[in-house]
Amino acid sequence: VADGAGADTRARIDTTYYYNYSEDTDRGFLPVTLDLNGNGLDFTGIDDSNVYFDVNNDGWREHIAWAGAQDGLLVLDTEGDRTIDKPEEISFARYHPGAVTDLEGLLAFDTNDDSLLDRLDARFKDFAVWQDKNLNGLSEEGEVLTLTERGIESIHLASDRLPQTLANGDVQLFGTSTY
């Protein structure tokens, strides 16, 4: 911050966002993260993250923890352009009434009610994995591949509901599943 006379100061400003998980408001940012290399999920905590993403559709990009470069986020490519820049492309709880997590939100896309997201579901082709290899929070060429391109045939929509806290407390997992 600088004043008109040229004096300046640098200070860290932390903000905390509280989300009201009700039917009528944003349910927060609880993305489905995929372990792509089989060694468990890795996350970059907020203090080490360079990622800013508009998580609540208010036009402001918030500083957030992020999936590690070897893992990926499940995304809904709403425009089919492999550009992921809207919260509704990365956060799915808003799509299913009563969903608290994004894995629960995916039930809205399970059109044949078999508790799987697979090719038998109408919008399976619209889902992809975003592997942000350079951890900048921007979906760039080669980072967003369809589930089919990734060799993912199905995602189980039931969680083990075993919570975990990772990335120095910056990431709260609400459970795991398989694909």
What residue ranges belong to the model's regions?
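Calcium-binding acidic motifs and repeat modules
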Residues: 1-179
